[in-house]
Regions:
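Structural signature of transmembrane alpha-helices in multi-pass secondary transporters
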Residues: 22-23, 54, 113, 144-151, ...
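Hydrophobic alpha-helical transmembrane segments
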Residues: 103-110, 114, 136-195, 253, ...
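Intracellular juxtamembrane helix-capping segments at the cytosolic ends
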Residues: 33, 119-132, 322-335
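Helix-loop boundary and gating motifs at the non-cytosolic
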Residues: 2-57, 212-262
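Helix-terminus/helix-capping segments at the ends of transmembrane helices and short amphipathic helices
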Residues: 38, 128-133, 138, 245, ...
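Flexible cytoplasmic inter-helical loops of multi-pass small-molecule transporters
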Residues: 136, 186-212, 399-406
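C-terminal transmembrane bundle of multi-pass solute transporters/carriers
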Residues: 50, 60-64, 71, 75-77, ...
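Hydrophobic core of transmembrane alpha-helices in multi-pass small-molecule transporters
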Residues: 20, 101-119, 228, 296, ...
Length: 410
């Protein structure tokens, strides 16, 4: 099979193009919202509410949306969610015109945007398998991820520089990008698979089985919960507008660069891991990576130099990539095939929404103790979690090879 096999139809380029456009628009918009809301309210709590407004619908809708994506055409679900995101960009534009000094209308639109994400992410995950045969899936996933990583790196920087032209220009660009993304998604071809409907009780029983599986496997539970609490405590992304404006004095352009820095570290680390994968002492590497994430977060909080702050954010992204690589590998090896969908839904529900909940925690802590102490305390909290999890989950700490997580055959 040649390297170009997965590109022989228009569907894969259209699918990837749709994902790149929606990812870019989301990240550009997040930079604009963060700067605009903080500019209006001048309190870190306002930035925490930005995360909370998205977290509640995202957390509530992830599992139902995943089940819905199995019963209806995921292309329709994805296109509809992206149209909803485009509507949100239009509403942000309207709020900027009609209510330029009040954040409350923006919070309502953010909740709608979180609901749209709750539907778009499960649909995106399920759609690729509809578009390519099994033998082309691995290459399609690899190419999709590489281009999305480019979007994650470039999106915040583009958002910061776009915002120098004003929020109206930024939201207008996002609206157009979401509409184009929806058009590409709606035009996708591919294979349809009818999974059939099931009773509500049966769906929730399947979800409960996934939760029980995670709870009963120390390696899986430890890996998922370690990542969850590290992001909750150590994430500083929500407070970057405060640092850009009041600490480092670099404006919205600098904010975009700060937001891109973790993705740069993650991308470089992903390239390194692809060439030199972790083969031994996987558990030790996992805990060291999370500890490094916490330490770099503390150093970022204490920094007053823009370039040192960039380096520390790159380190957090690199450490997070190592953690994600090991966690995903351990969970995949530990989970038998019949349980993969349910375990994946559970981990996505808790880890996928933890960024927004972590944003709220950061905003609350900063409102109580100040921005810099909040970041330092969060990084220190991550180190405490690492020490506690080493004692609570010794099987995770002692994992050598990633394949050691494979359950024994009885």
């Amino acid at each position: 099979m040649t390297g170009s096999t997965v590109y022989r139809t228009r569907d894969i380029p259209a699918f990837i193009g749709s994902g790149v456009l929606s990812t870019l628009a989301s990240l550009v918009q997040s930079v604009a919202i963060g700067w605009q809301v903080y500019d209006m309210e001048r309190t870190p709590l306002a930035l925490g509410l930005v995360g909370l407004c998205q977290f509640v619908p995202l957390f509530a809708l992830t599992l139902p949306a995943g089940e819905l994506a199995d019963r209806i055409d995921p292309r329709r679900l994805l296109a509809g969610a992206q149209i909803m995101q485009a509507v949100c960009s239009g509403l942000f534009l309207l709020c900027t015109v009609l209510s330029p000094h009040r954040a409350l209308p923006f919070y309502f639109v953010l909740a709608l945007f979180g609901a749209a994400r709750g539907f778009s992410e499960p649909a995106t995950q399920s759609l690729l398998a509809f578009l390519v045969p099994p033998e082309g899936l691995a290459k399609a996933i690899a190419r999709n991820n590489s281009l999305l990583t480019t979007s994650v790196i470039g999106g915040p920087a583009v958002g910061g520089f776009l915002y120098t032209a004003g929020p109206m220009a930024t939201y207008s660009v996002c609206l157009v990008a979401f509409v184009a993304s929806a058009a590409l998604a709606a035009g996708l071809g591919g294979r349809r698979v009818d999974h059939g409907a099931s009773h509500l009780a049966e769906r929730w029983e399947r979800v409960a089985e996934g939760i029980r599986f995670v709870r009963q496997r120390p390696i899986v539970l430890g890996a998922v919960s370690l990542d969850l609490f590290a992001v909750l405590l150590g994430g500083a992304a929500a407070l970057l507008p405060v640092f850009a404006r009041d600490v480092l004095h670099v404006g919205p352009g600098g904010l975009g660069i700060l937001r891109s820095a973790p993705a740069v570290g993650a991308a470089l680390t992903a390239f390194f891991l692809a060439r030199f994968p972790i083969e031994r002492r996987s558990g030790t590497h996992l805990f060291v990576a999370v500890a490094l994430f916490g330490a770099a977060t503390m150093a970022f909080g204490l920094s007053r130099n823009f370039y040192l702050s960039l380096v520390m954010l790159c380190v957090t992204g690199a450490a997070d990539m190592v953690s994600v690589f090991i966690r995903q590998s351990l969970i995949n090896f530990a989970t038998p095939d019949p349980m993969r969908g349910r375990v994946g839904a559970v981990t996505m529900m808790f880890i996928g929404a933890s960024n927004e909940l972590g944003d709220f925690e950061s905003g609350m802590t900063a409102a109580l103790f100040g921005t810099i102490p909040a970041v330092v305390i969060g990084g220190l909290g991550t180190l405490v979690v690492v020490a506690a999890w080493m004692r609570l989950f010794p099987p995770l700490w002692k994992v050598d090879r990633l394949t050691d997580a494979v359950p024994a055959v009885s």
